[in-house]
C-alpha cells in the first residue's frame, strides 16, 4: 500500500556502530530472544544493521499480515539462508525467487506430499515411533531421558525411511549418525556467521575449512543414498524416486544430479529439525502444565484405548492437535522467515521500505500479539487452539510453516508424524520431569530446541516392552494364506448401458499433489459404469476448448495457498476473464478437496470455479461436493457424493444403482482357444543367465543373454523393455480361488474404457500373470462389492464393517488386496468378471542393453537387481515383479520384450577410426560400454583401424570388477585400454593409488587431454556423484585451466560444447 497523504516516519532501532553494526546488541547464542526483547523497547517494528546489511523486523499480526501479501512481497534468501546455499544451492528451501530449479522441483515433489501419499506413509512413521517406545520402555522409570536427542533420532529416521527408504537406525547407536553431527555443526556455524560482519567471517578461516568439510560429508552421504537406490531400485512412490525419475509436468525436464543432492539434504535437514523441536517443546509444556498432560492422555484413552494407533485415529485427537498448535504458537521452531518488497513500498501506513530490503516477521513475537491472543498471550493454553477458536484467528496470525507458495511443502508430513508420536507415547507411558526445577533454555541454530531438558518415562499398566513389538512386525511372521476354490462358474451378464443413456461427460481436474487426478480417474470409471460416454479426462487448463453445450462437465479441484493448482491456473484466469453468459447450455458439477488447517483458503478455488461457472451461464446439475483431507478419506468422500448427490441429480434411480452396483460387472466373458498376448511385445528366448554377485552381497545382480525375435533390431547403447509376469504363487492363488485351470481361455468385452485386452481370446493365466496387479490394496468400494456377493449375513456384515469402521486398521494398514480378502472370506461368490474389473494394469520395466548387436546377431544382454523384501501387507515377502520373473527364467525360457531407443548421441562412432572415444563408468554403469567395446572388437576383426579408446572404470575392488576376464582379453587385443579405481582397495596395483574414478582420470590427464584435442568424444555412465565429479575434472583437463581461476567462463565453455563431444547418462 502507498500512503501519499501520510507523514512517513523512520523505522526505529538502536544506533549502528561502524563495521560491526548492531552485532553487540544481540546475544549471538540467543539471537531470537534478543530480537523478541527489542520489540518491548521499540514497538512492533524496528531495524538493525547486521553483518553490514540493514534488516527490518516486525512483531505483530497487522504488519505480518501485510508483508505476507504475495502480490507485494516475496520470499528472499538472506543471511543464514544465504549461507546455507553453499551446501544446498537452489534447493526448495534456499532458492531465490524465480530460480528455475525451484519451480521444477516444486512441481515434481508436490504429488509426493499430497494427503493420500502422506496417509500411505503412516506405517513407516509408526515403525520408527515404536522403536522409540521400545527404547524408553527398556530404560525404566528412573532413567533421565535426553528428550531432544531422542526426538532428533526419531524424526531423522522417519524422514529418511518415508522419503528415501533409508534406515539410519539411530536408536541402535550410542552417538548420533555422523550426518547429524555434521549437519548440526554446520547449522550452528551458519547461524553464528549470519550475525557477524563480513570482515569477521573472512578472518574465521577455521570455520570456513570446517564448513567445507561438513558440506562435503553431507553431500557424500546423500550421494551414497542415491547410489544405493540406483544400484538397488525399488518400485516405491517416495521422494527419492520422484527426484530420480519424475519430470516436471509443465516443462518435461527432470532434476540435475546436483539438484537431486540439494533437495535430499534439504529434506533430511528441514524434515527432522523443526519436528523434533516441536515434540520436545510439547512435552516440556505438558509437564509444566500437568492438567494438560492428563487431559491429553484421557483423550488418547478415549479415542484409541489399548488398540494400535491408526491413521484414522489422528483426526479425532482434537486436544492433541490443539497442544501442537499452541506449542508452535509460543515456540515456532522455524522462528522467522524473510520477505522483501517487489518494489519500493510503505508498511503500516508510515514506514518506507525499499525493494528487496529484508523484512523478518519474528514469529515468537507475532504469535504473542495481545491484540489477537488477549492479555494472556504469553501463556500456554491449548484450549485457545481447539477447532472453533483456531479457525476464527485472523489471517496470518499463526505462521509456523512459513508463507504462501514458499511455505513448508512437508507440513502435512510433519503434522501426521508429530500427532502419531505424541499419541503413542501418551498411550504407552506416564511422564515426569527429571529435574522439576528446570527452567526452559533454548538452543538456537537456524531452528530452536529446548536445551538440557530431560524427562523420565514409566510404562503404563497395560503396556510391557514385550508387547511393544509393532503389530506390523508381528504380522510379518504369519504364513502366507492362499485362497480356496470358490464359485467355479462365471456367468456372463448382459451389457447394460444404464440410465446415463450414452450422454457425453468430460472430466477435468486441478491437481499438484496428484490426489485430484486420481479422483477424476475414479469418477471417469464410475461414469462409464452407469452408461455415460466419457469424452476426456484431463487437466483443467485443457478445459477451455472442451466446454460445449451438449455434454456434462465434471470438475475435481483443490486449492494451493489460496491459488489454483499449476495445471488449473490458465483455466481459472480464463474463467475470470469471461463476461456475460458465454457458457449458457453447459451443465456442470464441482467436487472440491481441501484441508481445514488452511482455514482462510479452505475450498477457495472449488467454490470460485463453481460460482464463476454459474455466473457465466452454465447450469449447475448437482450441489458442490467436498472432501476434507484432515478428517476423512478423499476417495470415500467422492463415492458418497456420487451415490447420494451426483447420480440422483443426473437421473440415475436407486434401482439402477442397485442393479449396476459394484457386484455387477461391465464385462462379458466367454472361453475360447488360446491366443497370442500383447502385440507390441514380442517373444525373446533366454540363452544364458547368471548371477554376477555372491550370496553375501547386499545387492544381487544378474546377467542374461536373450535371443531376440525376428526383425527386432537395436543399436549399441539402446534399452530393452520387458513385459513381466506376476509371481506364480500369486497367480495360482487367483486361479484356485475361481477354480480355473491355467490354460482356460477367456474373451473380454467391455462397455466402458479398460486397458484389458478386449475381443481377443486370452489365457486366464496370461491375464492374471501379465496384465493385472494382484497385490494392490482393496478399496472400500471393492470391499462393499465383496459384501454384496457374500452368501451369508455374518460374512456380509463383517465385510461392510471392513469397508467402513475397520477399513484403516484391518485393510489399509495391513495392505490387504482383494485376493487376500477372497482368501479370508470363502463364502463370497464373486464373479471372475467383477474380480478382474477391480484390478489395475501391470506395467513393463526397462533395462539397459549391455551388448553390441553384431557380437551375437539377434541377441541382446541385460543386467538387473533382484527385489525381494518384507511385504507391507504381512502376507509373506514383496517380490519385485520383473526382477524375480527374470531371475526365475532358465535358458530356453521365453520373455516378451520391446526395444526402446536411447539418446541419439550415446552411441559409438560408425567409423571407429574417425575419432577417439573415452568411456567413464562406475559399477553397473559399465553395461552400455561393454556393448561399445564389443562393437570395436568386431570392427578390429574386420580389418578396420581403430582410433584410441580409453575405459575408466571404478568399483569397490577386484571382487566387484565386473566382466574382468572379458575386459582383460579386449585390452590384450588392443581394442581398449582400461584404467581402474578401487574405492575399497586403492592400493591394489590396478588402481594406481586411486580410490575414485575422477582421481584416476586426473592422474591420466595428459593422455586424456591429447585424445580430447584429437576430437575424442567422452561418454559417462554412472551415479550422480560420479557424474558431477567427472564433469569437474573434465573441465579442468579439457578447458586447459587446472586451477579453475575463472570457473564461470569454464562452465560457460562446457555448456557451449557440441552435445556429441561430451555425453553423460545417469545409470539407474
From Swiss-Prot:
Its EC number is 1.14.14.1, 1.14.14.130, 1.6.2.4. Binds 1 FAD. FMN binds at residues 511-515, 590-622. Residues 464-498 are annotated as: Disordered. The keyword NADP applies. Residues 472-498 have a biased composition (Polar residues). Its cofactor is FAD; FMN; heme. Heme binds at residue 408. Keywords: Electron transport, FAD, Flavoprotein, FMN, Heme, Iron, Metal-binding, Monooxygenase, NADP, Oxidoreductase, Transport. Transmembrane segments: none annotated. It holds the Pfam family p450. It is an enzyme of class 1 (oxidoreductase). In the N-terminal section; belongs to the cytochrome P450 family. Self-sufficient cytochrome P450 monooxygenase that catalyzes the regioselective in-chain hydroxylation of alkanes, fatty alcohols, and fatty acids. Preferentially hydroxylates 1-dodecanol at C3 and C4 (positions omega-8 and omega-9). It is very likely that CYP505U2 prefers dodecanol, and probably other fatty alcohols, over fatty acids as substrates. Does not show any significant activity toward tetradecanoic acid. PANTHER family: BIFUNCTIONAL CYTOCHROME P450_NADPH--P450 REDUCTASE, NITRIC OXIDE SYNTHASE-RELATED. This is Self-sufficient cytochrome P450 monooxygenase CYP505U2. It comes from Exserohilum turcicum (strain 28A).
Amino acid at each position: 500500500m502507498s500512503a501519499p497523504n501520510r507523514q512517513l516516519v523512520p523505522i526505529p532501532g538502536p544506533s549502528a556502530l561502524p563495521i560491526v553494526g548492531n552485532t553487540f546488541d544481540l546475544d549471538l547464542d540467543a539471537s531470537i530472544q534478543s530480537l523478541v526483547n527489542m520489540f518491548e523497547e521499540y514497538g512492533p517494528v524496528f531495524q538493525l544493521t547486521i553483518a553490514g546489511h540493514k534488516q527490518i523486523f516486525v512483531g505483530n499480526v497487522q504488519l505480518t499480515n501485510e508483508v505476507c501479501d504475495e502480490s507485494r512481497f516475496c520470499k528472499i534468501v538472506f543471511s543464514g539462508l544465504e549461507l546455507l546455499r553453499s551446501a544446498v544451492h537452489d534447493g526448495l528451501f534456499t532458492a531465490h525467487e524465480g530460480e528455475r530449479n525451484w519451480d521444477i522441483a516444486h512441481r515434481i515433489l508436490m504429488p509426493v506430499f499430497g494427503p493420500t501419499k502422506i496417509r500411505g506413509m503412516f506405517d513407516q512413521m509408526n515403525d520408527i515411533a515404536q522403536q522409540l517406545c521400545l527404547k524408553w520402555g527398556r530404560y525404566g522409570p528412573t532413567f533421565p531421558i535426553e528428550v531432544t536427542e531422542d526426538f532428533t533420532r526419531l524424526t531423522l529416521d522417519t524422514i529418511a525411511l518415508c522419503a528415501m527408504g533409508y534406515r539410519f537406525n539411530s536408536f541402535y547407536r550410542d552417538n548420533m549418525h555422523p550426518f547429524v553431527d555434521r549437519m548440526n555443526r554446520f547449522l550452528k556455524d551458519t547461524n553464528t556467521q549470519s550475525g557477524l560482519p563480513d570482515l569477521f567471517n573472512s578472518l574465521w578461516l577455521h570455520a570456513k575449512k570446517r564448513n567445507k568439510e561438513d558440506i562435503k560429508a553431507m553431500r557424500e552421504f546423500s550421494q551414497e543414498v542415491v547410489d544405493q537406490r540406483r544400484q538397488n531400485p525399488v518400485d516405491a512412490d517416495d521422494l527419492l524416486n520422484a527426484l530420480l525419475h519424475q519430470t516436471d509436468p509443465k516443462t518435461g525436464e527432470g532434476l540435475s544430479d546436483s539438484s537431486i543432492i540439494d533437495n535430499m539434504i534439504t529434506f533430511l535437514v528441514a524434515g527432522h529439525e523443526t519436528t523434533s523441536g516441536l515434540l520436545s517443546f510439547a512435552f516440556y509444556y505438558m509437564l509444566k502444565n500437568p492438567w494438560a498432560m492428563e487431559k491429553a492422555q484421557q483423550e488418547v484413552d478415549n479415542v484409541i484405548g489399548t488398540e494400535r494407533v491408526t491413521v484414522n485415529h489422528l483426526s479425532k485427537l482434537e486436544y492433541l492437535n490443539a497442544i501442537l498448535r499452541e506449542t508452535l504458537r509460543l515456540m515456532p521452531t522455524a522462528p522467522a522467515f524473510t520477505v522483501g518488497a517487489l518494489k519500493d513500498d510503505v508498511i503500516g501506513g508510515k514506514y518506507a521500505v525499499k525493494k528487496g530490503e529484508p523484512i523478518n516477521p519474528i514469529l515468537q513475537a507475532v504469535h504473542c500479539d495481545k491484540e489477537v491472543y488477549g492479555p494472556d498471550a504469553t501463556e500456554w493454553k491449548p484450549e485457545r487452539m481447539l477447532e472453533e477458536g483456531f479457525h476464527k484467528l485472523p489471517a496470518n496470525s499463526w505462521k509456523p510453516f512459513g508463507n504462501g507458495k514458499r511455505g513448508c511443502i512437508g507440513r502435512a508430513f510433519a503434522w501426521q508424524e508429530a500427532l502419531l508420536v505424541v499419541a503413542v507415547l501418551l498411550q504407552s507411558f506416564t511422564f515426569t520431569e527429571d529435574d522439576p526445577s528446570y527452567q526452559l533454555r533454548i538452543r538456537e541454530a537456524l531452528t530452536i530446541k529446548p536445551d538440557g531438558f530431560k524427562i523420565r518415562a514409566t510404562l503404563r499398566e497395560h503396556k510391557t516392552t514385550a508387547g511393544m513389538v509393532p503389530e506390523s512386525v508381528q504380522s510379518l511372521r504369519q504364513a502366507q494364506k492362499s485362497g480356496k476354490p470358490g464359485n467355479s462358474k462365471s456367468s456372463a451378464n448382459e451389457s447394460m448401458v444404464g440410465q446415463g443413456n450414452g450422454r457425453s461427460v468430460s472430466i477435468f481436474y486441478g491437481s499438484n499433489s496428484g490426489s485430484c487426478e486420481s479422483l477424476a480417474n475414479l469418477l471417469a470409471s464410475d461414469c462409464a459404469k452407469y452408461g455415460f460416454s466419457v469424452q476426456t479426462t484431463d487437466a483443467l487448463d485443457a478445459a477451455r476448448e472442451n466446454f460445449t453445450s451438449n455434454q456434462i462437465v465434471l470438475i475435481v479441484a483443490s486449492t494451493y495457498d489460496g491459488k489454483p493448482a499449476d495445471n488449473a491456473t490458465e483455466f481459472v484466469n480464463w474463467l475470470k476473464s469471461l463476461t456475460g453468459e458465454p457458457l449458457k447450455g453447459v451443465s456442470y458439477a464441482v467436487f472440491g478437496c481441501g484441508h481445514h488447517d488452511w482455514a482462510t483458503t479452505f475450498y477457495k478455488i472449488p467454490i470460485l470455479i463453481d460460482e464463476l461457472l454459474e455466473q457465466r451461464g452454465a447450469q449447475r446439475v448437482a450441489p458442490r461436493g467436498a472432501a476434507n483431507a484432515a478428517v476423512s478419506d478423499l476417495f470415500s468422500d467422492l463415492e458418497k457424493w456420487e451415490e447420494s448427490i451426483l447420480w440422483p441429480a443426473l437421473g440415475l434411480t436407486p434401482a439402477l444403482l442397485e442393479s449396476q452396483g459394484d457386484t455387477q460387472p461391465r464385462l462379458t466373458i466367454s472361453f475360447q482357444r488360446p491366443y497370442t498376448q500383447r502385440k507390441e511385445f514380442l517373444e525373446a528366448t533366454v540363452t544364458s543367465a547368471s548371477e554376477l554377485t555372491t550370496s553375501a552381497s547386499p545387492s544381487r545382480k544378474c546377467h542374461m543373454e536373450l535371443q531376440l525375435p525376428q526383425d527386432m533390431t537395436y543399436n549399441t547403447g539402446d534399452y530393452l523393455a520387458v513385459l513381466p509376469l506376476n509371481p506364480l504363487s500369486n497367480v495360482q492363488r487367483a486361479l484356485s480361488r475361481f477354480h480355473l485351470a491355467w490354460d482356460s481361455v477367456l474373451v473380454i468385452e467391455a462397455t466402458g474404457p479398460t486397458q484389458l485386452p478386449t475381443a481377443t481370446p486370452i489365457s486366464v493365466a496370461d491375464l492374471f500373470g501379465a496384465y493385472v496387479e494382484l497385490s494392490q490394496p482393496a478399496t472400500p468400494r471393492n470391499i462393499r462389492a465383496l459384501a454384496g456377493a457374500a452368501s451369508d449375513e455374518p460374512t456380509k456384515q463383517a465385510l461392510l464393517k471392513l469397508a467402513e469402521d475397520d477399513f484403516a486398521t484391518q485393510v489399509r494398514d495391513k495392505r490387504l488386496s482383494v485376493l487376500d480378502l477372497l482368501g479370508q472370506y470363502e463364502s463370497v461368490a464373486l464373479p471372475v468378471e467383477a474380480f478382474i474389473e477391480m484390478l489395475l494394469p501391470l506395467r513393463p520395466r526397462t533395462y539397459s542393453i549391455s551388448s553390441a548387436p553384431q557380437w551375437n546377431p539377434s541377441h541382446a544382454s541385460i543386467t538387473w537387481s533382484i527385489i525381494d523384501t518384507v511385504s507391507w501387507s504381512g502376507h509373506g515377502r514383496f517380490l519385485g515383479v520383473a526382477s524375480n520373473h527374470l531371475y526365475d527364467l532358465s535358458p530356453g525360457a521365453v520373455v516378451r520384450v520391446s526395444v526402446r531407443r536411447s539418446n541419439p548421441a550415446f552411441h559409438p562412432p560408425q567409423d571407429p577410426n574417425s575419432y577417439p572415444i573415452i568411456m567413464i563408468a562406475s559399477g553397473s554403469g559399465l553395461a552400455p560400454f561393454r556393448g561399445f567395446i564389443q562393437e570395436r572388437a568386431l570392427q578390429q576383426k574386420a580389418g578396420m583401424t581403430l582410433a584410441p579408446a580409453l575405459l575408466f572404470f571404478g568399483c569397490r575392488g577386484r571382487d566387484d570388477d565386473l566382466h574382468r576376464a572379458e575386459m582383460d582379453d579386449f585390452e590384450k587385443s588392443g581394442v581398449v585400454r582400461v584404467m581402474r579405481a578401487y574405492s575399497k582397495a586403492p592400493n591394489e596395483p590396478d588402481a594406481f593409488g586411486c580410490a575414485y574414478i575422477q582421481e584416476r582420470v586426473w592422474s591420466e590427464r595428459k593422455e586424456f587431454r591429447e585424445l580430447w584435442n584429437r576430437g575424442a568424444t567422452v561418454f559417462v555412465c554412472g551415479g550422480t556423484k560420479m557424474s558431477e565429479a567427472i564433469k569437474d575434472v573434465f573441465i579442468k583437463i579439457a578447458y586447459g585451466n587446472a586451477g579453475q581461476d575463472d570457473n564461470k567462463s569454464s562452465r560457460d565453455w562446457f555448456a557451449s560444447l557440441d552435445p556429441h563431444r561430451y555425453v553423460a547418462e545417469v545409470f539407474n
